[in-house]
Amino acid sequence: MFPEDEYQLEFFRTEGFVRKVCESCGGSFWTRDASRRTCGDPPCDPYSFIGSPVFREMELDSMREHYLSFFEAHGHTRVQRYPVVARWRDDIYLTIASIADFQPFVTSGQVPPPANPLTISQPCIRLDDLDSVGRSGRHLTTFEMMAHHVFNTKEHEIYWKDRTVELCDELLLGLGVDPESITYKESPWAGGGNAGPSLEVLVGGLELATLVFMNLRLDSSGEYVIKGERYSRMDNYIVDTGYGLERFVWASKGSPTIYDAVFPDIVRELSDLAGVEHDLHDPEYAEIFARNARLAGMIDLGEASLRDLRKRIAESINTTPERLERIMAPMERIYAIADHTRCLAYMLGDGIIPSNVKAGYLARLVIRRTLRMMKDLKLEIPLSEIVEMQISKLDYDDWRERMETISEILSLEEERYAETLEKGSRMVSKIASHYSKKGGRIPLTELVSLYDTHGIPPEIARETAGALGVDVELPDNFYSIVASTHSRAEQREVETRSPPFEKTERLFYYRPFDQEFDATVLGIFEGSVVLDRTLFYPEGGGQPADRGVLVRDGQVFNVNDVQMIDGVVLHRVEQEGLSPGDRVTGRIDMRRRMAHARHHTATHIVNDSAKRVLGRHVWQAGAQKSEDRARLDISHYRRISDEELKAIELEANRRVMEMIPVITEFMPREEAERLFGFQLYQGGVPPGREIRVVRVGSDIEACAGTHVTNTGMIGPIKILRTERVQDGVERIEFAAGEAAVQRIQERDDILAEAASILRVPIEQLPRTVFRFFEEWKDQQKVIEHLKEEIAGIRILTLSSEAVDVNGVSIVARDMGESDGETLLKAATMLSERDITAILGGASGGAAKIVVSVGRSGLERGLNAADIVRAAAKYIGGGGGGKPDLAQGGGPNVGGLRAAIDAGMSAARKALQV
């Protein structure tokens, strides 16, 4: 907690505020109403604005514009929204707050903000309360955080606490809020590695805004403890405010739920399609949802169950929980679908591709939850149509242009969901059977695993298991639990010792085509040589390290690996002997360097070409370069077709032939982001104030690799193959320059060899191969016919060899050189004649045993699988099958006769002979 003096503001004193302690929760708050006894925050105070709006009615667009214009009029610069997928962050997948736009580089002071002070209305996505959406009356997955931010330094303060509260108060009073209804509640805040005192702004029981005064940073040895973590003072201090756009609109309308305030048209449309009557003009009906929202606002839905909430509401309106469920459940699903489809509009509009990992996992989670609720409501409408309704209400032209792609993505997801439901029942049945035998219920961990690994919704698991009489552990907040485990990127802690040297001068950026350089040895660090300057490129960004030699007075030291730690380049050499102060000459393996440079620049071109052909949703998911080939992983919602692949290859080679200059320059991060946006971070987010920007035509990325200076230097680009490395990610493997020529020559050699074998020109290969294939198919038919005739003749012979064993006809025979198919046909034909067959044969250097049991043998208890297992030991193998037909095999052809005899003995024993 923060001491009282953190909140003793001049503004509060001059405006007649008094500091009070809430009689309910014990928290401190500021109010103009001296008689007030509670803080205004639920559960201390219920929602009083429902049915009694706190200011004039506003829609989303008008409220947003009013807010932004207000702060522009007070000296703030309006900043455009950031994407909801946090491309500039490597620790989170989604933009969860407006301050996330400026973490970590601006908040840490490394990079100046885009404006100071600034105002923004930032769409955010939080899935922590996913299961409460629709049920609570107030929770949303997607919301706009209107904000004004100030980034103060010790040298220059723009404004701090007093002015922040003054602006907030002026905004509220200007909207018509009763001054005495406003409370400012003291509350410590922490998030994203920062912390500070904050004030929650409450009106009518609803938190409209939070004013955070960020002045602490996470520090394990810090003097301040906030929410169990230690913090120390920051060099800068930041005004971080968040005003909930949707909450302001709700407070202005006083509707029973936030969904009726924010999505009135969508809710009405979905209600009509689902055949659900939603008449908020009916006082009794509206009061049910209003009471639900008021009660939900008073309790923690993470701790209380939906059943408890239903019971309390039912008691308050003198009805049964069952009747209440019938009234509310359909509308709760409609509310959630309205919310979720807006969430999907932002996710897919900003380029997320549904998959099983990272942000794609979260998108698929929302899609499948939406589809499940649509199924429950029997909504016969494509999901894409509802998302299109949402997009039509959002003012983003580029989204409308991409609607065809978004529709295709959602259609594919619907198909995949249907397939999942089909296979899910079978899988759950097996698991339910397992837990049924143990006498327990299916645990939560199993349900999470079913969803994470196979995409099977918990509701399907509950229905399927319930039909088998098995209970499941399914909490009300299941989806919130799952979402929380996937909301942040995995942070891998790699322990490395920082080299005690100045940063190495990196000559490879300024002299990329020089082969030789002179340098001084600064020292040896963990077996690697540290120089004051180097041309050797260290491994990084998917590009392998350079190789070459260091030469001292004629003595050669082979450099076989190069790494960089904290700006210090480490040269791993095979020989020992170098010492600090030695002067050396370095020579680079330029053939390797140029192969890497060609492949690296080609990667940028192929990535850009894929965007042109497949769509702007394509985003680099990984890359690796080598001397002889490169690979690029891209986000895409389906397999790349052959035609699309050809188009990408052609587009890439056109970029080569255009001889586009490759421009590399170091730029301040904020300037690069302002000029080029977040496409800069296709290959990841580099650290530091200054970043290296590589421009290859329309492809512009932050990149530290080596490149050619003109696309014409790349030479040909040949795509070798594609594969789906994971759901939602396609891998394109290609070669460039000399490596591409070698791959083309290898394919030419294969074609030439094939043409030589068939004795036709290469141009006639397809026609000739097709003709041979057709002839081969015809010959196969003839061969099959002949095999059947031969088998028929053999059957007559074998039938005559059958011996009677206690009333069962059995034939045991070594068929010589025979494949498994021939043996199976013969054995099947014999069993149809009610003859049990034990047949052996050899093919391709391996022995094969097939056993079939006729009707009379089955009646007497003969089991083909048992006979095969007894026989297969003698050929060094095993086998199995069904009682009427089984087969086995092994490498010991010489033991075939003994195996057949063993099979016969097993049959006799079974027949008690």
From Swiss-Prot:
Coiled coil feature spans = none
Q: What is its EC number?
A: 6.1.1.7
Name where it mostly resides.
cytoplasm
Q: Which GO terms describe its cellular component?
A: cytoplasm
What is the top-level taxon of the source organism?
Answer: Archaea
Compartment list: Cytoplasm
Which GO molecular function entries does the Swiss-Prot or TrEMBL record give? alanine-tRNA ligase activity; aminoacyl-tRNA deacylase activity; ATP binding; tRNA binding; zinc ion binding
Family matches, as InterPro entries: aa-tRNA-synth_II (IPR006195), aa-tRNA-synth_II/BPL/LPL (IPR045864), Ala-tRNA-lgiase_IIc (IPR002318), Ala-tRNA-ligase_IIc_anticod-bd (IPR018162), Ala-tRNA-synth_IIc_core (IPR018165), Ala-tRNA-synth_IIc_N (IPR018164), Ala-tRNA_lgiase_arc (IPR022429), Ala-tRNA_ligase (IPR050058)
**Cross-referenced Gene3D superfamilies:** 2.40.30.130, 3.10.310.40, 3.30.54.20, 6.10.250.550, Bira Bifunctional Protein, Domain 2, Threonyl-trna Synthetase, Chain A, domain 2
| GO biological process annotation, one example | alanyl-tRNA aminoacylation
Q: How is the cofactor bound?
A: Binds 1 zinc ion per subunit.
What chemistry does it catalyse, as a reaction equation? tRNA(Ala) + L-alanine + ATP = L-alanyl-tRNA(Ala) + AMP + diphosphate
Entry function: Catalyzes the attachment of alanine to tRNA(Ala) in a two-step reaction: alanine is first activated by ATP to form Ala-AMP and then transferred to the acceptor end of tRNA(Ala). Also edits incorrectly charged Ser-tRNA(Ala) and Gly-tRNA(Ala) via its editing domain.
**Protein name per UniProt:** Alanine--tRNA ligase
Taxonomy-wise, where does this protein's organism fall, top ranks first? Archaea, Methanobacteriati, Methanobacteriota, Stenosarchaea group, Methanomicrobia
